[in-house]
Amino acid sequence: MVPSTFSRLKAARCLPVVLAALIFAGCGTHTPDQSTAYMQGTAQADSAFYLQQMQQSSDDTRINWQLLAIRALVKEGKTGQAVELFNQLPQELNDTQRREKTLLAAEIKLAQKDFAGAQNLLAKITPADLEQNQQARYWQAKIDASQGRPSIDLLRALIAQEPLLGAKEKQQNIDATWQALSSMTQEQANTLVINADENILQGWLDLQRVWFDNRNDPDMMKAGIADWQKRYPNNPGAKMLPTQLVNVKAFKPASTNKIALLLPLNGQAAVFGRTIQQGFEAAKNIGTQPVVAQVAAAPAADVAEQPQPQTVDGVASPAQASVSDLTGEQPAAQSVPVSAPATSTAAVSAPANPSAELKIYDTSSQPLSQILSQVQQDGASIVVGPLLKNNVEELLKSNTPLNVLALNQPENIENRVNICYFALSPEDEARDAARHIRDQGKQAPLVLIPRSSLGDRVANAFAQEWQKLGGGTVLQQKFGSTSELRAGVNGGSGIALTGSPITPRETTDSGMTTNNPTLQTTPTDDQFTNNGGRVDAVYIVATPGEIAFIKPMIAMRNGSQSGATLYASSRSAQGTAGPDFRLEMEGLQYSEIPMLAGGNLPLMQQALSAVNNDYSLARMYAMGVDAWSLANHFSQMRQVQGFEINGNTGSLTANPDCVINRKLSWLQYQQGQVVPAS
């Protein structure tokens, strides 16, 4: 019996060892699920890795790898491949996978520029149900779906996202929050309603108020920011100031005591250079006053047509256009104010400084490199010019340390801390037109442009701005010479409100439906061009002679009740317009620089007198006056976001590259008169 008992005890003692060996042996043959770490964001790889893992896995693990591959493909810009893989997802998913699928569907919509579809999908997601890394993606999707348009929802999304980010991403988040706040008008800000417990949002809105009150006074702004940081020490923006406000705190005004003015004074461009010089010197000696941005105006008595100066390629145009392309040098409708001016949003003026030393350098007489060397030796504190595009390109290559207000802009803008770019550009005018037309509630614009590089540039600028504002496809139609237009009128063909889509620079893949995200193709050109009734706005870039044919041809083909509002650039405006022309243009809206729209009547009279009533040169004169204002506020334009000057060529603001943008006045022909556009 003893041996038997011993055997049983021995067997009992060995059993756990055997079981453990079997368990460990089983573990050795089972590969752990690595997809969880990637799903939770603790590990990352590219789409090729995820696709390989997907092929080698099965069941839930395979689905996880498939979801990860879709996420990576979207991030890599391979939207079409992501959609194809998305459509292969099985219907049966667990809760975690289902939430990831919905989030991915929204991210794909964003990649396809289907912002409304993305917002619909995001509305179905409860952020609290998501993992932390998914929450960061969710809020980023909400931010992207807003398209940068400032709103209370965008601010809340940015605030919710901030705690989920690393240090580098936090600065980007804070800068984006400030961008949204500073993009609002004061009227928009006044309509915001927040909850009592939204302390962070309240702090941001108080900072916005400091900015509204002091943005044109850098010293007051500095003090206001410092006080705000003391009052809201726990606000993310107080701990890490927006980059733009850091620049404000470091603000130092630029000196204009010694100015170098670089202009062509000989050759074909001399007439423009000397006119800008006249305007600049007049402002220096007399000073400037804020201009009324929008006024009611009516045409004065008709004047005799003035000869136009010879156009010169490369003058005051950012894309090698002639001056006519740049300034629309046909005379503008002569106008006088007939109603009270609107309140200025930025009462900024540049005082006279007759004692300031001004030296003119002729860029047509010697290489720019030599001129810049001489300017530096002469001790200039700021350079205004050059005017010609090729000279601006040379300026950038020189890497000059001087502060420069260039009177043109290069093909490819370079952000230099000491350079701002101020040009009268048809592209700027097109972008302003897109904003104006969008503000009037239009949804489907057609751009009528000349068959030229000018037309292509204007169309592209308009379409880019339109889509930036959240608009959809922009159509374009090109016209030929005046003789071709005349033949069209005689033949009774007219102009149909149809066109081909302007090809965006950023290509997008086809969309997905909201309810069942599956691949769909984008509409064809025929689907766009055959829907003539869709067009509700037509932006026309034409000379007075061309538009005199174009507008009747539109009515000839579509009838006077087509429902489309017609808009035109200042290229079509003319001071010699008689009553017949004004009646023919009934209802047409057109853009014009504020000075020639009646916003500064004394200066308009002064400018026209100086240039013998030549409206094209009057625009260049106004450019010279505004150049003086910009030179006197160079540091503010360069460093203070939102700083604005109501100038004679437009309401002037600077983008982050210090390209000066111009908001123009909009006028309308009404019963033979010129009035503000409604």
Curated annotation (Swiss-Prot):
One of its GO terms (cellular component) is periplasmic space. GO terms for biological process: peptidoglycan biosynthetic process; regulation of cell shape. GO terms for molecular function: enzyme regulator activity; hydrolase activity, hydrolyzing O-glycosyl compounds. It is a lipid-anchor. Keywords: Cell outer membrane, Cell shape, Lipoprotein, Membrane, Palmitate, Peptidoglycan synthesis, Signal. Pfam families: LppC (PF04348). Regulator of peptidoglycan synthesis that is essential for the function of penicillin-binding protein 1A (PBP1a). PANTHER family: PENICILLIN-BINDING PROTEIN ACTIVATOR LPOA (PTHR38038:SF1). Interacts with PBP1a. This is Penicillin-binding protein activator LpoA. It comes from Escherichia coli O6:H1 (strain CFT073 / ATCC 700928 / UPEC). The gene is lpoA.
